[in-house]
């Protein structure tokens, strides 16, 4: 008969749980646990609002953070346009359900996950993301929420926090992770700057010109090489 263990016989939490875990270091004493932080739209999947603009024929919905760096200004413009045309959340979701990841994106994410922890840091919304994230194998996604009324009209949005991509990188670094980040637009640049290494991917010329401190590449093969170059581990393609 198995011996009974009483509460008094067990110290909880266990003593080991109170001992800080040692950092996992490489041969030269650098943190060897690395997180790859990626933007979503324009990097792994099409720009959702551009796809919706093409479907509806509403040219003004094509604007993204590549065009309007202030995300609050951009979203208020989008919500106003949706309201003017009587478009609901379901209308946007119907278009999203037809989209596929960019060519090579699924293979790239699989390649990355074999070598890094992978987190998607995006200014998209959970109400948009599921069809595309399913095709990417559901990597971790940190993003925002939309607020709708009882008629499915999008009335507002809830940001996770101010400058959320940079704040996420700061939080990961506080846990002693080393961060390599990739993005394509203005709203990614604070994340890239806070990361241990930042990479522009599929970025337009104006963003590349304004942020020459970041290497800029345009294919997934080039992006793999930049991640290998930025890592403090010996990695291969």
Swiss-Prot record:
Binds 1 Mg(2+) ion per subunit. Pathway: Amino-acid biosynthesis; L-serine biosynthesis; L-serine from 3-phospho-D-glycerate: step 3/3. The keyword Repressor does not apply. It catalyses: O-phospho-L-serine + H2O = L-serine + phosphate; O-phospho-D-serine + H2O = D-serine + phosphate. Keywords: Amino-acid biosynthesis, Hydrolase, Magnesium, Metal-binding, Serine biosynthesis. Its cofactor is Mg(2+). GO terms for biological process: L-serine biosynthetic process. The active site is at residues 39, 41. Its EC number is 3.1.3.3. Mg(2+) binds at residues 39, 41, 184. NCBIfam families: HSK-PSP, PRK13582.1. Phosphoserine phosphatase that mediates dephosphorylation of phosphoserine in the serine biosynthesis pathway. Also able to dephosphorylate phospho-threonine. This is Phosphoserine phosphatase.
């Amino acid at each position: 008969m198995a011996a009974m263990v009483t509460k008094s016989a067990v110290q909880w939490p266990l003593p080991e749980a109170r001992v800080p875990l040692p950092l996992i270091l490489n041969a030269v004493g650098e943190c060897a646990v690395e997180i790859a932080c990626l933007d979503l739209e324009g990097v792994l999947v099409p720009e959702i609002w551009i796809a919706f603009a093409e479907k509806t024929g509403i040219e003004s919905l094509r604007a993204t953070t590549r065009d309007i760096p202030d995300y609050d200004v951009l979203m208020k413009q989008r919500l106003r346009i949706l309201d003017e045309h009587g478009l609901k959340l379901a209308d946007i979701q119907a278009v999203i359900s037809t989209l596929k990841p960019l060519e090579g994106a699924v293979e790239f994410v699989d390649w990355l996950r074999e070598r890094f922890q992978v987190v998607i840091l995006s200014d998209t919304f959970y109400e948009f993301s599921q069809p595309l994230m399913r095709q990417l194998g559901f990597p971790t996604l940190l993003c925002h929420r939309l607020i709708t009324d009882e008629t499915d009209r999008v009335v507002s949005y809830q940001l996770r926090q101010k400058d959320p991509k940079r704040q996420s990188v700061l939080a990961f670094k506080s846990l002693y992770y080393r961060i390599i980040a990739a993005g394509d637009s203005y709203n990614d640049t604070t994340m890239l700057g806070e990361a241990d290494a930042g990479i522009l991917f599929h970025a337009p010329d104006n963003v590349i010109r304004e942020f020459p401190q970041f290497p800029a590449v345009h294919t997934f093969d080039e992006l793999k090489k930049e991640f290998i170059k930025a890592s403090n581990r010996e990695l291969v393609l």
